[in-house]
Amino acid sequence: MADYYNVGKVTSPHGIRGEIKVYPLTNVPERFYDIPYIWVFDEKDIPCKYEIENVKITSKGMVLLKLKGIDSRNDAEKLKGLFLKVDAENALKLEEDEYFITDLIGMKVYTEEGELIGTLEEVLQTGANDVYVVKAKEREVLLPAIKEVIKKVDVEGKVMIVRLLEGL
């Protein structure tokens, strides 16, 4: 099966002509202007390909999409809660030390000494730098995504090695 990457989640229908309101899961919402089609996976994980007919980005950072074949509010309602994905061909090309959030979620996080901290569960986008939320046994550990802390990321092995700074 091809690789697919989440780029948004449908939050609700918008209007009566089949538009959908999408919460972008990318730090570049404008990329929707350049994507010719999107993949939607239903509850049974069956993919369906939709051509993007129109894109608008709201002042609040949400994305409004009109997909070919989704022509009514009822059609749009059926997509509510589903993730929009791009295939590898349409994925953004990453720079060194950049990762797709979907690749980071679920990683086991270890200290440089080999001690398991926990599992990376969420990425907070704060502006200055991302913050990784790691679920430990009895608490959450917040790790700034900076070179001083993140020492190694093994996407294939789903492992991250970190150096804990004073106070973390």
UniProtKB/Swiss-Prot annotation:
Entry keywords, A to Z? Chaperone, Cytoplasm, Ribosome biogenesis, rRNA processing
Q: What is known of its domains?
A: The PRC barrel domain binds ribosomal protein uS19.
State the family it belongs to: Belongs to the RimM family.
**Ranges where the PRC barrel domain occurs:** 96-168
Q: Which domain of life is it from?
A: Bacteria
Q: Does the keyword Translocase apply?
A: no
Quaternary form?
Binds ribosomal protein uS19.
GO terms (BP aspect) = ribosomal small subunit biogenesis; rRNA processing
Job of this protein: An accessory protein needed during the final step in the assembly of 30S ribosomal subunit, possibly for assembly of the head region. Essential for efficient processing of 16S rRNA. May be needed both before and after RbfA during the maturation of 16S rRNA. It has affinity for free ribosomal 30S subunits but not for 70S ribosomes.
Q: Where in the cell is it found?
A: Cytoplasm
Q: Species name for this entry?
A: Caldanaerobacter subterraneus subsp. tengcongensis (strain DSM 15242 / JCM 11007 / NBRC 100824 / MB4)
Protein name in UniProt: Ribosome maturation factor RimM
Gene Ontology cellular component terms for the protein in this record: cytoplasm; ribosome
Gene3D superfamilies, alphabetized: PRC-barrel domain, RimM
Entry's Gene Ontology molecular function annotations: ribosome binding
Q: Name one Pfam family in it.
A: PRC
